[in-house]
Swiss-Prot record:
Protein name as it appears in the record: Conotoxin PnMEKL-04
Pfam families: Conotoxin
Domain of life according to the entry: Eukaryota
Propeptide section residues: 20-45
InterPro entries (UniProt xref): Conotoxin
Length: 77
């Protein structure tokens, strides 16, 4: 009876150690995919960050890195 109990405990430990990496691995993979999809290239971000460089089409000044919008982002007013 003791051998059966020990065998069951060993089996339970082995199964639990196998289940942990598999369950966490799926979530980590999904998180990595979401992170990579959200990343922007330097060209998408603009030269100065998350704004549009000059000569990009705009509707509001906040879209432009220079905060100057006249249908297109401008370097100065």
């Amino acid at each position: 009876m003791e051998k059966l109990t020990i065998l069951l405990l060993v089996a339970a430990v082995l199964m639990s150690t196998q289940a942990l990496p598999q369950g966490g691995g799926e979530n980590r993979l999904k998180e990595n995919i979401k992170f990579l999809l959200k990343r922007k290239t330097a060209a998408d971000r603009g030269m100065w960050g998350d704004c549009d460089d000059w000569l990009a089409a705009c509707t509001t000044p906040s879209q432009c890195c220079t905060e100057v919008c006249d249908g297109f982002c401008r370097l100065w007013e």
